[in-house]
Design a protein with these regions (language model features):
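Short amphipathic alpha-helix with an adjacent loop that forms part of the alpha/beta core around
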Residues: 107-117
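A short glycine-rich beta-strand->turn/loop micro-motif centered on a GG-aromatic cluster
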Residues: 122-130, 148-161
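Active-site rim beta-loop-alpha module in soluble metabolic enzymes
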Residues: 93, 97-98, 104
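Short acidic-hydrophobic, aromatic-tinged amphipathic segments that line or gate anion-handling sites
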Residues: 96-97, 177-179
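Catalytic cysteine-centered active loop of the rhodanese-like fold, especially the PTP/DSP P-loop
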Residues: 96, 117-142
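Active-site acidic carboxylates
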Residues: 1-95, 116, 150, 159, ...
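Histidine-anchored nucleotide/phosphate-binding helix
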Residues: 30-37, 134-144
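Short, well-ordered secondary-structure micro-motifs
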Residues: 54-56, 106-109, 135-136, 162-163
Length: 179
């Protein structure tokens, strides 16, 4: 049995760039510590857009160019990948580039991992609680209903504190375990 950690969108543009916030910056150390102490595979997701982002439906609702592939703001904030790769255990570290909030690729990857070595639990951390974290938590609960999905609230931040709390409540109602 294995436990899996999913680190959602801890990218420069989402932490302290175009979409950054003080709340996002405050969780970076917590996320780093969670990674350093995690005994199992870690998957980093990256919000990934093209230069025509503003023409997309998401871009029309959120007209702030961010996380354009291979730009400085698209990269994971310093220290997190290094923390994952520097762990004393030899568990894999992988990446998923996702073009929108929820990722069916993440679900598919976890289903594949589960078929090879059963997953005991999945833990989600990262940004933004009220957009990508909640979207993926619900997808994972729907696709892997018998695997506990944990959300470490000390390692998440929302667009606002109110929307962060609302997302945590929503995930609890959908049988995610919010810590």
């Amino acid at each position: 049995m294995q436990k899996v950690l999913v680190v959602m969108d801890m990218q420069k543009d989402v932490v302290d760039g175009a979409l950054g916030s003080a709340q996002a910056q405050l969780i970076v150390d917590n996320v780093r510590q969670k990674i350093e102490n995690f005994d199992g595979p870690i998957i980093f997701t990256r919000d990934t857009h093209d230069t025509d982002y503003l023409e997309s439906q998401e871009g029309k609702f959120l007209p702030v160019t961010h996380c354009v592939k291979n730009t400085e703001g698209w990269h994971i904030v310093p220290g997190l990948i290094e923390a994952a790769e520097g762990r004393p255990i030899m568990s894999p570290v992988s990446f998923i580039d996702k073009p929108n909030f929820g990722s069916f690729e993440l679900l598919s990857r976890l289903e594949g991992m589960n078929s090879v070595n059963p997953i005991e639990s999945i833990t989600l951390v990262g940004l933004c609680t009220d957009i990508c974290v909640v979207s993926n938590a619900i997808i994972l609960k729907a696709g892997l209903p018998e695997i506990p999905v944990y959300v470490d609230s000390s390692c998440c931040a929302g667009v606002t504190e109110e929307s962060h709390q609302a997302a945590l409540t929503t995930m609890k109602m959908c049988q995610c375990i919010v810590e």
